[in-house]
């Protein structure tokens, strides 16, 4: 049902895009808009992951440079029946994470140093399981298409204002009114559709992520910490590129301006409540988390030995053990 709803919303955005093209240039403008939409999505399909990772200066790591973090992702990917994704670290104090890639065979997951420093290993596992759920559900591709179309609709809405619409279809005042409505309504409508798609997929990824890591309370605890951290610690790169906000597990925008007027994510308390209900239905009453170890020295990095012995000697067990 979620995939059907998502497909319908993307189709709606495509119709909106073509409609603005029609206002600008009649039938020819509509076809040009369609060609532009297809071209932009093809470019995004092949290059969006590289672009966003470069945007956040993400550093790829492996089993030698980040053993615990890498093995954790490897174990979770095995639990989910997924190919091993590329694993990245973003040097950013705000705790957060995202996944990208056009399909499970070409996927990447990234976590900030703030997340790896501030969360327990179990909470990190819950977060990375959520990101792998996005990969498994192919949400990374869906959201790339939605974001591309939303940006294109906004761009064409502005063009409609400056160009004054198609003269053949303008017919005086009605043409002017139609152009103004396209300029104002289309970007907001695209934003609302983007929000609807993102919110639907977040709930699905929470549920599947909890199944992958085995304990919904790990993810619910992590969401609370990340939400508090996102409010307290600005993510400057995300503030400069708000179009990427929907990719993160929690909205990274601090709301210093009007960034949070329309949220790309469901309410965090509602997500936590859903996960707690899921845990109760599974008969899980406790997250079973060991106390978070002190952050390692800068030389080893916050991901080098977070939580103790990677073989499980610190007393906790999880999919990374």
Swiss-Prot record:
Binding site for Zn(2+): 130, 134, 202
GO function terms (MF aspect): metalloendopeptidase activity; zinc ion binding
One GO BP annotation of this record: proteolysis
Transmembrane segments annotated in the record for this chain: 7-24, 29-46, 145-165, 173-193
Cofactor comment text: Binds 1 zinc ion per subunit.
Cofactor: Zn(2+)
Keyword Ubl conjugation attributed: no
Active-site residue list: 131
Main location: membrane
The organism's place on the tree of life at top rank: Bacteria
Pfam family, one: Peptidase_M48
EC number: 3.4.24.-
Subcellular location field: Cell inner membrane
Region (Disordered): 287-321
Record's keyword terms, sorted: Cell inner membrane, Cell membrane, Hydrolase, Membrane, Metal-binding, Metalloprotease, Protease, Transmembrane, Transmembrane helix, Zinc
Keyword Transmembrane helix attributed: yes
Xref: InterPro entries: HtpX_protease, Pept_M48_protease_HtpX, Peptidase_M48
GO CC annotation terms, alphabetical: plasma membrane
Enzyme class: hydrolase
Biased composition (Gly residues): 304-321
Topology relative to the membrane: Multi-pass membrane protein
Family under the similarity heading: Belongs to the peptidase M48B family.
Name of the featured protein: Protease HtpX homolog
Naturally occurring in which organism (per UniProt): Brucella anthropi (strain ATCC 49188 / DSM 6882 / CCUG 24695 / JCM 21032 / LMG 3331 / NBRC 15819 / NCTC 12168 / Alc 37)
Lineage of the species this protein comes from: Bacteria, Pseudomonadati, Pseudomonadota, Alphaproteobacteria, Hyphomicrobiales
Gene that encodes it: htpX
